[in-house]
């Protein structure tokens, strides 16, 4: 599954979180599941719907869509497309509502699925972490909390390394000393279902920059 948000946005003019658009998004998912069942019967090979974040395609598919359809506001105007059925990364929604919403789509992703909530540094608020984890356990198949763990080797800054635009390109910058050297910046972000410490293509970097907190 890719770009459920963009598909529904183009077809209805609304986010798939809008109550009037959610049934259409779920209908698409069910139609895809029905197709998998049909192919399985035809070929005697198992087919299944997988809610994949698939790291490399978020940028590649965005460029292909722009080339084919041009720039469509709210649909193809970014360097990335939304992972699977997820709420758009820039959409303001709290952690519990996001998990509740996406749980509907996980039930229609029998091949695998994962959801995320973006949180600030929670080391001094473990009660809140436990509350979210309990909600995950009670309400959704699989989900993770994303936090930030960065370090600048040049000045010793221990906090969030920022993404800034420099000469038309997105780069990582230490907010304390201005260091741009990726060799001396330790940046950890969740991408494609795991916490990565390598740097990312421009599309994924734009997506990371656009993420809003859910707590």
Locate predicted features.
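Long, C-terminal-biased catalytic regions of enzyme "large/alpha" subunits
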Residues: 1-215
């Amino acid at each position: 599954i890719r770009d459920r948000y963009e598909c529904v946005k183009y077809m209805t003019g609304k986010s798939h979180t809008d109550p009037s658009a959610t049934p259409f998004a779920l209908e698409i998912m069910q139609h895809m599941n029905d197709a998998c069942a049909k192919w399985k019967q035809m070929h005697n090979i198992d087919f299944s719907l997988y809610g994949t974040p698939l790291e490399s395609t978020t940028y590649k598919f965005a460029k292909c869509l722009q080339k084919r359809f041009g720039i469509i506001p709210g649909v193809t105007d970014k360097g990335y497309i939304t992972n699977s059925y997820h709420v758009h990364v820039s959409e303001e929604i709290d952690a519990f509502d996001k998990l509740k919403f996406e749980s509907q789509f996980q039930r229609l992703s029998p091949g695998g699925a994962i959801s995320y909530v973006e949180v600030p540094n929670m080391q001094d608020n473990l009660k809140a972490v436990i509350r979210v984890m309990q909600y995950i356990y009670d309400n959704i198949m699989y989900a993770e909390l994303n936090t930030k763990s960065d370090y600048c080797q040049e000045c010793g800054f221990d906090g969030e390394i920022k993404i800034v635009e420099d000469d038309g390109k997105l780069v990582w910058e230490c907010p304390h000393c201005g260091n741009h050297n990726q060799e001396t910046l330790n940046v950890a972000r969740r991408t494609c279902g795991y916490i990565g410490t390598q740097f990312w293509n421009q599309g994924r970097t734009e997506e990371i920059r656009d993420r809003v907190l859910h707590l």
